[in-house]
């Protein structure tokens, strides 16, 4: 009984530790989004690269249409 309880507590602790580490390891991304009616990501990625965004971008589809979001290398100035 004690072994099972210890295993459960240890497993739970390791899972929480992994969740905390994974959130710390992935920095927040910043995007410059333009509503252009995109449908797929490849044309949007090429558009972002041609506009000077080295990481490209992705097309996000919302209820009001497609939005091309270019990946910024750092947080934009306010």
From Swiss-Prot:
Residues 1-25 form the signal peptide. Disulfide bonds join 33-70, 38-59, 44-68, 48-69. Keywords: Antimicrobial, Disulfide bond, Fungicide, Plant defense, Secreted, Signal. GO terms for cellular component: extracellular region. It comes from the Eukaryota. One of its GO terms (biological process) is defense response to fungus. It is found in: Secreted. Belongs to the DEFL family. This is Defensin-like protein 90. It comes from Arabidopsis thaliana (Mouse-ear cress). The lineage of its organism: Eukaryota, Viridiplantae, Streptophyta, Embryophyta, Tracheophyta.
